[in-house]
C-alpha cells in the first residue's frame, strides 16, 4: 500500500467512525473546513489536556489566559500582520491551480534528499556488511552531484526568501523544472503576495462600522495582556503565559485534510525572559517540546527539527518540530525566539509603557520572548496517522485498530454484556456507573462480542470489559486489551485501579522529567 492510499484510508476512517466530518456536508461542504465528530472531539480535548497540564499544571511559573478572538485593529498593525502577513503564490496557467511558491521549492528540495537516500540504500544492499556509508556519501559521483545541486538551490531559495525576491523565487521554480502536479506543465504566472487575514465589519451600520480582523494567531492576545497577568499574578521573570484558542487564515492553498485549514486551533505559550538570555531558553524549550512529542511513543525517528530558511519579521531564531506524516515530514510545532519585537511594538503603537522592573538587576526593560506554538488540528492528524494500524490475524481475519496512547483515547472502557438477558445488562450498567465519573465509558450490547471488539478497536478503546455468566457467580469480568487482544479475568472492584494505571496522564508526564 502506498502512503497516498494509506492517507485516503485514514481520511475515510475518520469520517466512518465519528472523528472528522466535512463541514456543512448537506450543502456539499465548504473548502478546507471540517467538523469534529463525537470521537474526534474527545481525542482533541485529550490532546489539549495533555498540552495544558504539562505546560501550566507542571510549571509553577506558567499561567493561562483565554483572550478574545476580536481585538482592536491597531493590534494587527503593531504586530506587523497588516503589512507583512503574506504568502507567495503562483498559478499554473494550464490547470488554473494555485500553489505556494515556497512550498513547491521545499518539496523539490525534499525530493533531492530522497534521491540521495535511495542511492545510499541501494549501495548498502550491494556492499552488505562492508558498506561504509560516510565514505560512500563523500565519494559517490551521483550522490555528490545531487547534493551539490540541492545545496545550490537551497542557498538561492533562502536568499530569495530573505530578500523577498519574488522574481528569483519564480526563476528557481523554472530552473528546477518544477511542473504542476495536475497539468504536468511548467507554464507558470509571476509570483504574487497574498495577505492571509480575514476582515469583517464591527458596528450597527455599514457607514459607521470599523474594519476588524479575525485573529490570525493567538499570540497577540497574550502580549497585550502581559502587564495584566504579570501584575495581578505577581509574576517574576522568567515566566510564561499559555493559551488555547481558534485562529483564522485565508489560506489560498488549503489541502491535506485537516493539516492546513482556514479555521484552526492553536496551543501557544509565550515565555518572557531577560534580554540576552533568550537563546539559552530557546534551546531549553526546543528540548522540552521534543520530549513532549516523543513521550507519546510514536517513534523517535519520526520527529526532527527543521530550522527556518527565512526568519519572520519578529524572530532572531526559529525551528520547527516536524513529524513524518503519510505525505512526508511536515511541521507540527514551531519554537521561535521573538526578541522584544511584539512588546516593543505594542508599546510604540499604544503609547503605553510595557516594561518589567527586574528586582535582581534593579533595571526596567522590555522582556524578550520565546514562543512555542503547536496546531491542535495538526497534532490531531499526527496522532491519528501514528495510531492507525491494519493487522492481519490468524485464520485470514484482519482488523483496523487505532493504537492511541491510552491517556489520549476518546473512550477508555467499553462495557459489554455477553447477552441481553440473565441480569448481565444490569451488572454491566452498574460497572459503567462506577467508572463514568473518572473516565469516558460506553455501554454496548448490539451485535456479537467479536463485532463489538472490532468496533472498539476501530475507535481506539484500550479496554473492553465483558460481563458473562461467571460474573454473576464470582464478581469477575473478562478484560480484553486493545493492542495485544489478550484477555484476563479481573474482579470488578479492581477495574478502576487497572484503568487508572494505564490511562492516567501521569504515565506521560513521568517521561517528561519536569
Question: PLM ranges: what are they?
Answer:
Residues 1-514:
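NTP/phosphate- and nucleic-acid-binding module
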Amino acid at each position: 500500500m502506498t502512503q497516498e492510499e494509506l492517507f485516503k484510508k485514514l481520511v475515510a476512517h475518520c469520517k466512518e467512525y465519528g472523528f472528522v466530518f466535512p463541514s456543512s456536508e448537506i450543502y456539499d461542504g465548504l473548502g478546507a473546513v471540517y467538523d469534529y465528530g463525537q470521537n474526534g472531539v474527545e481525542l482533541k480535548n485529550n490532546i489539549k489536556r495533555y498540552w495544558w497540564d504539562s505546560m501550566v499544571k507542571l510549571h509553577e511559573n506558567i499561567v493561562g489566559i483565554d483572550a478574545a478572538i476580536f481585538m482592536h485593529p491597531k493590534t494587527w498593525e503593531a504586530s506587523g500582520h497588516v503589512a507583512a502577513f503574506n504568502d507567495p503564490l503562483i498559478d499554473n496557467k494550464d490547470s488554473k491551480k494555485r500553489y505556494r511558491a515556497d512550498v513547491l521549492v521545499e518539496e523539490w528540495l525534499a525530493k533531492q534528499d530522497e534521491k540521495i537516500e535511495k542511492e545510499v540504500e541501494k549501495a548498502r544492499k550491494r556492499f552488505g556488511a562492508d558498506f561504509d556509508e560516510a565514505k560512500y556519501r563523500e565519494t559517490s559521483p551521483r550522490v555528490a552531484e545531487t547534493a551539490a545541486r540541492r545545496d545550490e538551490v537551497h542557498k538561492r531559495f533562502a536568499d530569495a526568501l530573505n530578500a523577498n525576491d519574488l522574481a528569483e523565487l519564480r526563476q528557481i521554480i523554472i530552473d528546477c523544472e518544477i511542473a504542476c502536479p495536475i497539468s504536468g506543465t511548467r507554464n507558470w504566472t509571476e509570483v504574487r503576495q497574498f495577505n492571509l487575514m480575514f476582515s469583517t465589519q464591527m458596528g450597527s451600520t455599514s457607514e459607521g462600522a470599523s474594519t476588524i480582523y479575525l485573529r490570525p494567531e493567538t499570540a497577540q492576545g497574550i502580549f497585550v495582556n502581559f502587564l495584566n497577568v504579570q501584575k495581578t499574578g505577581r509574576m517574576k521573570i522568567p515566566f510564561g503565559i499559555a493559551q488555547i484558542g481558534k485562529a483564522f487564515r485565508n489560506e489560498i492553498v488549503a489541502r491535506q485534510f485537516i493539516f492546513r485549514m482556514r479555521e484552526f486551533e492553536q496551543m501557544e505559550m509565550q515565555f518572557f525572559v531577560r534580554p540576552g538570555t533568550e537563546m539559552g531558553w530557546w534551546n531549553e524549550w526546543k528540548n522540552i517540546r521534543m520530549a513532549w512529542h516523543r513521550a507519546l511513543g510514536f517513534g523517535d525517528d519520526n520527529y526532527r527539527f527543521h530550522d527556518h530558511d527565512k526568519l519572520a519579521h519578529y524572530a532572531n531564531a526559529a525551528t520547527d518540530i516536524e513529524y513524518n506524516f503519510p505525505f512526508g515530514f511536515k511541521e507540527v510545532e514551531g519554537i521561535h525566539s521573538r526578541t522584544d519585537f511584539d512588546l516593543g511594538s505594542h508599546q510604540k503603537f499604544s503609547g503605553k509603557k510595557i516594561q518589567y522592573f527586574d528586582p535582581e538587576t534593579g533595571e526596567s526593560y522590555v522582556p524578550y520572548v520565546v514562543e512555542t506554538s503547536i496546531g491542535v488540528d495538526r497534532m490531531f492528524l499526527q496522532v491519528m496517522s501514528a495510531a492507525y494500524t491494519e493487522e492481519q490475524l490468524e485464520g485470514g481475519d484482519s482488523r483496523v485498530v487505532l493504537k492511541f496512547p491510552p491517556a489520549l483515547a476518546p473512550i477508555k472502557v467499553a462495557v459489554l454484556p455477553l447477552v441481553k438477558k440473565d441480569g448481565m445488562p444490569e451488572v454491566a450498567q452498574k460497572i459503567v456507573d462506577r467508572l463514568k465519573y473518572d473516565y469516558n465509558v460506553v455501554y454496548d450490547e448490539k451485535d456479537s462480542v467479536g463485532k463489538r471488539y472490532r468496533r472498539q478497536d476501530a475507535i481506539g478503546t484500550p479496554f473492553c470489559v465483558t460481563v458473562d455468566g461467571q460474573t454473576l457467580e464470582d464478581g469477575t469480568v473478562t478484560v480484553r486489551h486493545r493492542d495485544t487482544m489478550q484477555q484476563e479475568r479481573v474482579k470488578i472492584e479492581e477495574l478502576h485501579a487497572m484503568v487508572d494505571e494505564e490511562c492516567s496522564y501521569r504515565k506521560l508526564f513521568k517521561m517528561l522529567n519536569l
